[in-house]
Amino acid sequence: KMPGRDSAPIPDPLIWLAYLAAVTTTIKLATGILIVPQRNPLVLAKEIATLDNLSGGRFHLGLGVGWLEEEFDALNVPFSERGRRTDDYVAAMRSLWENETASHHGEFVNFENCICSPRPVQDRIAVTVGGHSEAAARRAGRLGAGFFPATGSHAELRRLHLLARETAEKFGNDPATIEFTSGGYGVFGPNALDEAQKLSDIGVERIVVPSFLFFKDTENLVAQYGEEVIQKAQSL
């Protein structure tokens, strides 16, 4: 069941970020997360390449395999295939982004001599795998991508991060490139810096703080949070 009310708006992330790209100049534009196996990989590759090109290389793909089986039923995508589809789709999209003429022959995606233009500004689109499970940690390692387990104890987060790095090494990827992100529910309030320090100690490099924590007085609260927490946390 989706959290919140049935009437709660959930905008399409890529359209939302295209709007933000037009009204900003430096902020990174990331999905958190985009459910890749629910989309056509060639169309998605084109959309992401266009967004990265128009934003000057600011796009960061946070992806997941999905969790709500009813969504997959509505889209006529087998729920049991979502992990394998994600791996195949990412490989296909990377081929389109990184080659002038791309070919890919996988379990679910097959194409020959395909051109995706405009190309992304980034040499390689930044990718982070979301999910607080061993499967997600292993996927991050296999793909040589960042890893974002949104929840979990410090011990559990440390264990999953280690698994992602071990898997990366097993598949010939540099473990040091597995950028570790964590949810920031605890990095808010009077103990924010203490929690940020604890997360930093277990290897977390980026903390994502939910925007709804600032909903009452957004502009002033974000500015205050920047001064009291973000600036100080950057030196940890």
List each model region and its residues.
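Active-site-adjacent structural elements that line small-molecule/cofactor binding pockets in enzymes
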Residues: K1-L236
